[in-house]
């Protein structure tokens, strides 16, 4: 029996097929590499590529379109150039650069693209953000009013930093800039502040040392390290701080507090200059491109203290700048000084004479941190800056004049004692209540008859003594944040008692 062909059935099937026929063709826009050198590829054919768009080379390496010219596109290569040759194809990815953000990154060392480089397995981040974000506007912000304690006496007393501030750390090489930053990170333990350390153009051994120090003090539990080493492509060094600040903004926008350190922006500017010159952009002063100010301003403006409606989170930035032979008037240092809310100036002369941290108190300033300083430390350090300035003046005078009158001699001696008080070994940040006690002791003359050489010993023995005999002093300063009459009386009594036992020893 022959099968009957039903014409209507066939026509129904054909109609269905026609209706469901999908003619969507996936069109990929590709280009060809014209030339490649020094981490930059010139590509022909990517007609509709956007500025800052990600592209992928045949070798699998990613790139970023930075120069859009009439006949070609200048693309910086984010990785190795070895597999990229003239004539190899490049395809658009139709997206801008994003990096992973969130708690999954804490405790990890990542590169500028947020990829792990610490051999601890993949990062399970659930969210990513654009690396280039617009800084928050005026209405979204609130003025800086909460302190960010660094644990360094000279800074917390004289150049206080507030949450949401941008404070520059500036000085020659080997003056302890990174140490100040690392101390600040170590001091955030238990303060609920997430720290991000961005290493730009550093030796890998230096970064490894920093990570080791942070692990040693248990600080990696709340720290992310972003590393673009000296051997990495200039494009990766250029992107590193933006990747770091994007990770920090995530915490700020979720009502949390973050601290970011850029170590250092001088090398960042050099990497950008290298990239710009290879892209044949016109050079300006010191051969930096014309937009090098904008390079740093758009980065540092992203640090802020948000208003209560947006969750009151904060992102504090401590950029580092390396000067050449103390020249603060060079192009990049002046740029960054004008962008930030103050600077901590470190001097090699002070460092070499044994005053460490080598902070020049006269040149260092915090433009907004005063509002964030706790009242107790304000009370004890009120006259400190002036005293130290007068001491420096007298010191210069005393070198030539042999006979000083009694009051000048006393002032000179007290100045020496205060300089000793402000000295501090690296990686040993002090709680704010301890700082208040020792500066109070110096300001009220309790160190006047202690030999300068014994000031460090006096300080080292004072804290355990108060902790054992007068624990309420530390407790009250910690909770009240002010030295009232009651606290002052106990403090005087404690210091007198301690002086008696110290003198006996």
From Swiss-Prot:
It is an enzyme of class 7 (translocase). The keyword Cell membrane applies. Its EC number is 7.1.2.2. The record marks 364 as: Required for activity. It catalyses: ATP + H2O + 4 H(+)(in) = ADP + phosphate + 5 H(+)(out). Keywords: ATP synthesis, ATP-binding, Cell inner membrane, Cell membrane, CF(1), Hydrogen ion transport, Ion transport, Membrane, Nucleotide-binding, Translocase, Transport. The keyword ATP-binding applies. One of its GO terms (molecular function) is ADP binding. Disulfide bonds: none annotated. Signal peptide: none annotated. SUPFAM superfamilies: C-terminal domain of alpha and beta subunits of F1 ATP synthase (SSF47917), N-terminal domain of alpha and beta subunits of F1 ATP synthase (SSF50615), P-loop containing nucleoside triphosphate hydrolases (SSF52540). It is a peripheral membrane protein. It is found in: Cell inner membrane. One of its GO terms (cellular component) is proton-transporting ATP synthase complex. ATP binds at residues 171-178. Gene3D superfamilies: 2.40.30.20, ATP synthase alpha/beta chain, C-terminal domain, P-loop containing nucleotide triphosphate hydrolases. Pfam families: ATP-synt_ab, ATP-synt_ab_C, ATP-synt_ab_N. Produces ATP from ADP in the presence of a proton gradient across the membrane. The alpha chain is a regulatory subunit. Belongs to the ATPase alpha/beta chains family. F-type ATPases have 2 components, CF(1) - the catalytic core - and CF(0) - the membrane proton channel. CF(1) has five subunits: alpha(3), beta(3), gamma(1), delta(1), epsilon(1). CF(0) has three main subunits: a(1), b(2) and c(9-12). The alpha and beta chains form an alternating ring which encloses part of the gamma chain. CF(1) is attached to CF(0) by a central stalk formed by the gamma and epsilon chains, while a peripheral stalk is formed by the delta and b chains. This is ATP synthase subunit alpha. It comes from Campylobacter concisus (strain 13826).
